[in-house]
Amino acid sequence: MSSVYTRPLARLIEQLQRLPGIGPKTAQRLALHLIKRPEADIQALAQALLEAKQQVGLCSVCFHLSAEPVCEICASPQRDNHTICVVADSRDVIAIEKTREYHGKYHVLGGLISPLEGITPEHLHIQPLIQRASQPQVEEVILAINPSIEGETTTLYVGQLLRPFVKVTRIAFGLPVGGDLDYADEMTLARALAGRREIEWQ
C-alpha cells in the first residue's frame, strides 16, 4: 500500500478490498467516508458486524442463512411443501424471494461442483436434499442454478440423483450464460421460474 496512506488507513483499505466487488478505488472511497463518520456510527457498524457473524448460522433444514435453528421460510405453514427450489447460495434465495412469485421451500447447496477448485459433491448439501426430496409430499424439485460450466455440472449431477423418485425441472434460461441469479432483475427471474421445464436427459 502506498505511503500516501497512514498505516491504520492503509490497513482499513486492504480489508475493504477483500470484500467481493470492492476494488482499490471503491475501498479508498469507503475508508475515507468511514473515518469521517462519528465514532458512535463506527461502533454501531462494528457491533452489527459482530452480532451478524455470531448469531447468523444455517437453517438445519434448508441451509439458508438463519438466526434460528429453522429459518422462517421452512417454519412457515403458508409455504408450499410440495415444491423445493434448489439454489447454490443464500443470495439466490433472496433474489427469488424478491420476485414474490415462488411460494415453495428452498434448499441451499452451499456452492457448485468444481473439480478445479477441489469442490466435490461431498462438500455440498446434496445428501440432505435427497432425503427431503424423497418425502411423499414433495412433488417437484426446481433446479435454479446459474448457467455456468460449474452450474451445468451441478444441475446434471443433482438431477440424475433425484429423477428416479421426483419430478425435476430447471428454470428457463432468460439468464445470460455464466450470470448470477442475484444479479438478474426481478422480472427476468420471475419469467425464468414461470417458464421452467423438465430436464432433457441424454
Swiss-Prot record:
Q: Which UniProt keywords apply?
A: DNA damage, DNA recombination, DNA repair, Metal-binding, Zinc, Zinc-finger
Pfam families per the record? RecR_C (PF21175), RecR_HhH (PF21176), RecR_ZnF (PF02132), Toprim_4 (PF13662)
Matches recorded under CDD domains? TOPRIM_recR
- This protein's source sits in the domain of life called Bacteria
Gene3D superfamilies under this entry?
3.40.1360.10, 6.10.250.240, RecR Domain 1
Cite a single GO MF annotation: zinc ion binding
Toprim domain mapped to chain residues: 82-176
GO BP field: DNA recombination; DNA repair
Q: Does the keyword DNA repair apply?
A: yes
ZnF bounds (C4-type): 59-74
The keyword Zinc-finger appears for this protein: yes
Role this protein plays: May play a role in DNA repair. It seems to be involved in an RecBC-independent recombinational process of DNA repair. It may act with RecF and RecO.
Q: Can you tell me which family this protein belongs to? A: Belongs to the RecR family.
Q: What is the protein named?
A: Recombination protein RecR
Originating species: Thermosynechococcus vestitus (strain NIES-2133 / IAM M-273 / BP-1)
Q: Which gene encodes it?
A: recR
